[in-house]
């Protein structure tokens, strides 16, 4: 596998980068980002680009799998148009350019409840992204749909941290069909994405509880 990764400067993307570089079936990882990715692994090649401008990175799209780990929050990006550009336009632009360059597989982080018809701005943007990338016609196309993501972020997000703490308190009560809404850790998402790239899955859209199962399988394979 030759991987292309966008979003490597984020929490989940950074973990996925390390997993990809450590795996014997991955011959190389190319990261495309606005900021420099601090990783000197011999299998890693990083490029600082404008992800909304294909001319700045199309020549670097040489690989088999595209991993999309980009995203933002409404707290960080209050402007709705800019928010939509990051959640929808950016991943779609990169995916379309990657397909034109011969990349056959895409695995993108979306969100649980993503739908073009959602009344929530976040889920609607992710739903539009899923719909439009799926329509491009990749040979393999997967959207991972995590619930609320845990982990420790470098930037301060007090409101998000509050909701994570509340969610952790009620997680044990979420059983049955509610189990998929439990918090999921970024390393779990990253491990599941690696497993999907290596083995595929029966569904295009993979919800949070299934991601935990796939991550466990990937960890078992590493033993």
Regions found by a protein language model. Name each.
Residues 2, 26-28, 104-105, 140:
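Residues at the starts of beta-strands that form the adenosine-phosphate
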Residues 2-23:
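N-terminal Rossmann NAD(P)H-binding glycine-rich loop of SDR-like oxidoreductase domains
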Residues 3-4, 45-100, 197:
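NAD(P)H-binding glycine-rich loop region in Rossmannoid oxidoreductase-like domains
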Residues 22, 27, 116-218:
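Oxidoreductase cofactor-interface core, primarily capturing Rossmann-like NAD(P)-dependent enzymes
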Residues 30-38:
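Short, polar loop motifs at secondary-structure junctions
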Residues 33, 80, 85-128, 135, ...:
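Conserved Rossmann-fold NAD(P)-dependent oxidoreductase catalytic core, especially the SDR/UDP-sugar
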Residues 43-45, 141:
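Short, conserved active-site loop motifs that form the nucleotide-linked donor/cofactor pocket
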